[in-house]
Amino acid sequence: MPPAIPKSRLSEGSPYPLGASWDGLGVNFSLFSANATKVELCLFDDAGEKELERIELPEYTNEVWHGYLPDARSGTNYGYRVHGPYEPEAGHRFNPNKLVLDPYAKAHIGWLKWDPAVFGYTLGADDLTFDERDSARFMPKSRVIDPAFTWGRERAPSVPWDRTILYETHVRGYTKLHPAVPEHLRGTFAGLGRKEVVDYIKTLGVTSVELLPIHAFVTDSHLLDKGLTNYWGYNSIGFFAPDPRYAAVPDFVFAEFKEMVARLHDAGLEVILDVVYNHTAEGNEKGPTLSFRGIDNMSYYRLMPDNPRYYINDTGTGNTLNMSHARVVQMVTDSLRYWATEMRVDGFRFDLGTILAREEHGFNEAHGFLQSCLQDPALSTTKLIAEPWDIGPGGYQVGGFPPGWAEWNDKFRDTIRGFWKGDPGKQAAMATRLSASADCFARRGRKSWASVNFVTAHDGFTLNDLVSYNEKHNEANGEDGRDGHSDNQSWNCGVEGPTDDPEIIALRERQRRNLLATLLLAQGTPMILAGDEFGRTQAGNNNAYCQDNAISWVDWSFGEKEVELAEFVRKVIMLRQSFPILRRARFLTGEYNADLDVRDVRWLAPSGQDIEEAHWNDTNAKCFGMLLDGRAQASGIKRPAMDATALLVLNAHHDVVNFALPEVVGGTAWRCLLDTNIPDHTRHEVFQTGETFEITGRSLVLFVLEPESRHSVALRRAIEGFRQMAERPIPMATPETGPEAERALSDAPGMTRA
């Protein structure tokens, strides 16, 4: 053990800011703990292996322990030993034999090495026992950083919500097999920031890259024992530190992250982080002591009121952060502010967001944390997206978050999947979901963008697998099929998995286009899962959280069909962006506007007439039209905006349906801009109002009314502009599969090309 250094080595320093702050002359160390009796600062060598000094923090102010170390510099590796009672039955688990990470550390060095010494109790015995082994040599260390970075001309894109299209991806998986990324940069922040990668994302037309968790995290020992890893990263142990495994040069991971953000911003792309403030990697009472548990277990975690030895588990991970404690709320908001200001990210997706607003008696829409995000000068201008559920009582809260927040909408996912699968009785629900789910979100002045629509996400089937598998195939996860959802609302179109049957292949391709077009043409904010635009597969694995291999990695070896699908997605995105009526801020009501003599939306039966009330829930009704009247786009002085009138027709029947094109004020002809059934998916044919259009079974068609008025020049230009833009090719990766990709694909369990 290194010698204990007198307190006099440290001056009193400051309780704020929390964490380790270098000012060029020394480092201020500050750590919150309401229940500790003493805190020791432990300094380590440059490799983070040898403990050099142990110094007691000299001051305690407002429940914060602090001290200033002159001549300390950036690059200093450190940790803490926190003294206090070890009384699990009272909620206290202090153990100074365990080195703990600073919750505010901006960087980590090294990796957790699973050993009995990292547990506060004697592993294999009762958690009431006290373990005296030193954990330091098995622990990663916190590191002091110099945050200096030259941003240059970088500017935040500030994409308006109505133009936002989210693109969910994984830093490692997106470029691990990318042929244009140098091998040493693949799977890193630097790889994601490469020009070839950024150019592809930009040309696709999405606006905001949503990254799966990049906070420092831990892989559970049971996964390592199986030769697996925590690939997704939903197991955070540091909310300020980017995980060094995503860096080409781990010692400078924070700078590499900033460089990636700058490159994406230069292209006008936003960066959204998936953040996990609901639990930590320390698990339940049988978990390790890595940070929060050993610093102040009673403050950081929600414990059972009648027996604080045990943790409330509303997350399914073993513990739940205590968002009723002011200091925990402060830590989370400080973390968000750090990423928004110092790291310049543009928004956040909150995993299990209900947790963040839980109080003693359940979810509270007026919770201080939710309100503080909206009032904070740095956070109020970012995009705030909640995953509005957890597994606790009353945890499902879709539509329950306050104004200013957007929410993942799983009702959209399930309804759209069921409709295109051919489930009966989905017509009414489908109309609601196409209208931004006003039944959930149209309250308190919220706008339609509050509904984040998705068909697939990281958790579940990819789009290709959704139309190729009826059942999950998670054998590679080593849990005997117990993991992952069993009800996926999927349909394999006749054969489970890959097939050579041309009819089934054609149907699957059309179903993918139907699902993507529905997602991108619905009101609300669309989110695409990266790789869905060219048919990425996970071989039927719907829970690939532990698969850091070709099951999860994006395969950039394209064939003609993959390129064709990506071109289709780009064209539909251009349609959405070209016509504001496809991305309204206001919710659709269908009510008659006497001032404008119009309804903003009409729902049409194949006869071309309004759907009658009695027929909304007709179990045989699987074809209908959504008519969006451009005259309803009124300004504050009740003057119609210059916008298109659009007709979206969806047919989930297996057979052709004759659909009568309605007569509408403002034009006498309908131009077909999109048809998911024909080879290039765009037609540009013109049909007269009143004419009958044959819509193929299981297909979607979009029409725009040809404007007849001389005042509609802008609309004609928008239509022509879309036609011209649609001819530009998308820059795809080289089609040849490199040796590493071939090797990865052949080695990954269960991977077979369709």
PLM segments and residue spans:
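Core domains of carbohydrate- and sulfate-ester-processing enzymes
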Residues: 82-150, 221-229, 234-235, 267, ...
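Substrate-binding/active-site clefts of carbohydrate-active enzymes
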Residues: 135, 170-345, 352-378, 395, ...
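Short, flexible loop/turn elements at secondary-structure junctions
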Residues: 33, 59-61, 71-73, 84, ...
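Conserved, mostly hydrophobic/aromatic
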Residues: 31, 80, 169, 201, ...
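Carbohydrate-interacting/catalytic domains
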Residues: 1-163, 167, 172, 499, ...
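Conserved alpha/beta catalytic core and glycan-binding cleft of carbohydrate-active enzymes
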Residues: 344, 359, 365-530, 534-535, ...
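A generic secondary-structure signal for well-formed alpha-helical elements
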Residues: 76, 84-86, 173-174, 178, ...
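Structural recognition of the beta-strand scaffold that forms the well-ordered cores
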Residues: 165-168, 208-211, 238-240, 347-349, ...
